[in-house]
């Protein structure tokens, strides 16, 4: 599956209200009809938060919400980009001179990332122009990867316009790399699941090499997504990139402590691999090697035997140069314990004991506690929402996505779903002060959706 290209499917546009509406809007915008459509889904990460960029496996599933783009290649060399949502302004630019401004996370920059990634992969300097109309129903800045879905969708659009072929794995790797044009140092989970997802199954996504394994979720439970309605724009915040750097520094200090060649080490997983020990043993090494008090740059330099100048020029990224404290112990503890929870989650799904929903729920609860206390990527609203979800019948509930806002994911016994939805809606969304005006997408049950594909009108 992963070595195949994304599927191309013929559809009767008239039978799909959303496609039909997009086709009509495209016609009124550009005065022509689309040649093809591309869709790429968002995702919910069930467990395994902030560990993909440390080299560890994660366990997401695609959601049914997606980014859908109507496309018409044109003879000019101009990219005309529009969005069905009037909040997002149009863009007209040369298809062969793509400029991405890292300082402004504008919506169209995510499209340009995907386009530029494919363009550079093939070394294309004369890309034909295209008219594109984008429609997305993934709530933005909610931790469901609306931005990565747009990058992936744009990558597949560009590939299709070029008439070239790439496997799903290659596409995922190119799109993950290209998102860095906008300054997001993610680990590749979002792009991988967007391409590798299959209907009806979650996936264990492993890295180096990238591969996906089916994980059958319990039939007696439903996964429910609840949006805290606190928006977190990942590329606009330094939180995320500081955590990436804290993990990198923790890996280097652990490697140095164990007399490994620390200067070559970038990820916490590499330390474990080089030592050849279990995740549980890595947690013990972390206890011995690192202290819970925050590290300042001077102490890190002393531990590694380098100068401040070397730390700044050789290790720190441009956006972490001015950080004064780094919590290395807490971040490493989270990563190693969360990586172990992912493997336990998969094992429970495979063995399917009678109390599996309860066991999976406990792992999700532990994950949230670690995200909140050790990784510090929660926020008061997420913690409140998690408590409400547990109170009204979720066996487990946790933040999902980068955190600092966005969504929670809860595992709910199927027979409790109607009362769960009603009670959570009342407790969280019906504020007496009327401060939350949620869209209908704020609370919904979801099942594993399929991956990115090309749609042709039959």
Swiss-Prot record:
User: One biological process GO term for this chain?
Assistant: galactose metabolic process
Q: Which GO terms describe its cellular component?
A: cytosol
What would be the name of the gene that encodes this protein? GALK2
Q: Which family does it belong to?
A: Belongs to the GHMP kinase family. GalK subfamily.
Which parts of the sequence are marked as the site Transition state stabilizer?
Answer: 43
| Active site positions, chain numbering | 190 (proton acceptor)
Q: Which GO terms describe its molecular function?
A: ATP binding; galactokinase activity; N-acetylgalactosamine kinase activity
Q: What is its EC number?
A: 2.7.1.157
Q: Where does ATP bind?
A: 143, 145-146, 233-234
Please give the catalytic activity noted in the UniProt record: N-acetyl-alpha-D-galactosamine + ATP = N-acetyl-alpha-D-galactosamine 1-phosphate + ADP + H(+)
Provide the species name: Pongo abelii (Sumatran orangutan)
Task: Describe the task this protein carries out.
Answer: Acts on GalNAc. Also acts as a galactokinase when galactose is present at high concentrations.
Q: How does it assemble?
A: Monomer.
- A Pfam family found in this protein is GHMP_kinases_C
The UniProt keyword set, sorted, is: ATP-binding, Kinase, Nucleotide-binding, Transferase
Read off the InterPro entries from this record: Galactokinase, Galactokinase_CS, GalKase_N, GHMP_kinase_C_dom, GHMP_kinase_C_sf, GHMP_kinase_N_dom, GHMP_knse_ATP-bd_CS, Mevalonate/galactokinase
Q: Summarize where alpha-D-galactose binds, as residue positions.
A: 43, 49-50, 52, 190
Identify the enzyme class. Answer: transferase
Which Gene3D superfamilies does the protein's record reference? 1.20.1440.340, 3.30.230.10, 3.30.70.3170
Protein name listed in UniProt: N-acetylgalactosamine kinase
């Amino acid at each position: 599956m992963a070595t195949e290209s994304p599927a191309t499917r013929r559809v009767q546009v008239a039978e799909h209200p959303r496609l039909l509406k997009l086709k009509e809007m495209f016609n009124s915008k550009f005065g022509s009809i689309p040649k093809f459509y591309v869709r790429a889904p968002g995702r919910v990460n069930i467990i395994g938060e902030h560990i993909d960029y440390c080299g560890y496996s994660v366990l997401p599933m695609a959601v049914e919400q997606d980014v859908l783009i109507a496309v018409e290649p044109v003879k000019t060399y101009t990219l005309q980009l529009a969005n069905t949502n009037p909040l997002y302004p149009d863009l007209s630019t040369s298809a062969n001179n793509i400029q991405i401004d890292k300082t402004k996370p504008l919506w169209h920059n995510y499209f340009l990332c995907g386009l530029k990634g494919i363009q550079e992969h093939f070394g294309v300097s004369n890309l034909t122009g295209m008219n594109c109309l984008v429609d997305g129903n993934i709530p933005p800045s909610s931790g469901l990867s609306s931005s990565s879905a747009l990058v992936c969708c744009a990558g597949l659009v560009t590939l299709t316009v070029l008439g070239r072929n790439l496997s799903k794995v290659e596409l995922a790797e190119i799109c993950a790399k290209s998102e860095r044009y906008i300054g997001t140092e993610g680990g590749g989970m979002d792009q991988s699941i967007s391409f590798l997802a299959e209907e009806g199954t979650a996936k264990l996504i492993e890295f180096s090499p990238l591969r996906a394994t089916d994980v059958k979720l319990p039939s007696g439970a439903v996964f429910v997504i609840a949006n805290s309605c606190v928006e977190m724009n990942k590329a606009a915040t330094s939180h995320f990139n500081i955590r990436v750097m804290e993990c990198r520094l923790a890996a280097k200090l652990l490697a140095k402590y164990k007399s490994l060649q620390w200067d070559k080490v970038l990820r916490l997983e590499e330390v474990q691999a080089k030592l050849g020990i279990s995740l549980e043993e890595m947690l013990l090494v972390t206890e011995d090697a690192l202290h819970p008090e925050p590290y300042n740059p001077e102490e890190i330099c002393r531990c590694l035997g380098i100068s401040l100048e070397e730390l700044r020029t050789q290790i720190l990224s441009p956006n972490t140069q001015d950080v004064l404290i780094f919590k290395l112990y807490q971040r490493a503890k989270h990563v190693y314990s969360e990586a172990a929870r992912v493997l336990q989650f998969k094992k429970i799904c495979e063995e399917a004991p009678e109390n599996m929903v309860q066991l999976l729920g406990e792992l999700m609860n532990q994950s949230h506690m670690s995200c909140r206390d050790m990784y510090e990527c929660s926020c008061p609203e997420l913690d409140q929402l998690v408590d409400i979800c547990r109170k009204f019948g979720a066996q487990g509930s946790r933040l999902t996505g980068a955190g600092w806002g966005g969504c929670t994911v809860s595992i709910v016994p199927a027979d409790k779903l109607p009362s769960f939805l009603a009670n959570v809606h009342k407790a969280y969304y019906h504020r007496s002060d009327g401060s939350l005006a949620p869209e209908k997408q704020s609370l919904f049950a979801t099942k594993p959706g399929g991956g990115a594909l090309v749609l042709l009108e039959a």
